[in-house]
Amino acid sequence: MGVERIKAAFENGKKAFIPYVMGGDGGLEILKERIRFLDEAGASIVEIGIPFSDPVADGPTIQRAGKRALDSGVTVKGIFQALIEVRKEVQIPFVLMTYLNPVLAFGKERFIENCMEAGVDGIIVPDLPYEEQDIIAPLLREANIALIPLVTVTSPIERIKKITSESEGFVYAVTVAGVTGVRQNFKDEIHSYLEKVKSHTHLPVVAGFGISTKEHVEEMVTICDGVVVGSKVIELLENEKREEICEFIQATKQKEEA
């Protein structure tokens, strides 16, 4: 399915709620169970983190989750195996969030073959500059897997146009300067930034980094096409507050009807 499965998540004005889970945090059975839960709860896409020892874009919550996964001996191969197994049960799109190093260490051809086998639909590589994306972009295109671009508040318009013109899936618009994590509120210029990104791409635009309340979700999906919630979802899963994740999903869906 690949790119088409991601496109379907945004069809007919749908707003996407994209939770992030760290692959292997709590073990691989827990990963499969969490994906099943998020699928049943109505999440649009699930973003699965590949743990890495030097996660430069991650805030403390995601760093701790990655460290727990690595300390427990979880491997990239193990995560792929878990995804292969759970893919038989769910149709929710899978997007991997991985730094470049694990891809190259695993072998990029082998990594992408495993993505295909596991039914991965897209990949986000936060430390892969646009200028160097040919390291993996041609292989991903061949495999019908979206290489999802990140744009930031400081990205000039021309760069946003260039980055998004050749991309597939959706555009990940980073809503804060700095790392991931929970924020209290967003500055007014974030609204104009998101509108600017939307006006310069044909792809759906999803806001991420720092989104941690229902009010944040409602605010963001009035402007763009969806949200990624990472640190807060990890906290809620850890503390068994799953009903709050369902409330986030409900807040997203309500904006479809508004």
From Swiss-Prot:
PROSITE patterns: TRP_SYNTHASE_ALPHA (PS00167). Keywords: Amino-acid biosynthesis, Aromatic amino acid biosynthesis, Lyase, Tryptophan biosynthesis. GO terms for cellular component: cytosol. One of its GO terms (molecular function) is tryptophan synthase activity. The alpha subunit is responsible for the aldol cleavage of indoleglycerol phosphate to indole and glyceraldehyde 3-phosphate. Belongs to the TrpA family. This is Tryptophan synthase alpha chain.
